[in-house]
């Protein structure tokens, strides 16, 4: 929600990445999500909402399933504030931001209860020289394509989700949602795409 972002911009503290989730607030996230759902429902269209990070969005979206699907990222299932900013500084800066543990816990609730439809990488890498810049001049984002599977397999090994859930979230559900033919499964007649 650009209006909320512009209003909150004054809350940014130069050099303090901890203010990133204050600027890009929960209110900003849920406002944008509500707007997308409202438009999709008004025009009876499908919408796939990326990078869900708040408990408010999880609660709202779980009541608007059907034509609405949504994604959570491995980053938001692995790191939470303020620990991530204390340990990683601007390397933990991304959009939407990493939030406190109550949001992290609700994201995992969504995964455990099959509320989210996909897990996506939000691949947005930057050069170290840029990530080392003082906040807010540091860019938001981190690598994701090459880390999605190893990070999520760690979560599988930790018992946070099953291997079958992970396969559904990263292989099977995306091809169903986007109508991609001959992908997402190991079946006769399908493309032989494998991760080893």
Residue ranges and their predicted role:
Residues 18-44, 113-119, 124-195:
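His/Asp/Glu-enriched, well-ordered alpha-helical/loop segment
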Residues 1-119:
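Histidine/acidic residue-rich metal-binding segments in metalloenzymes
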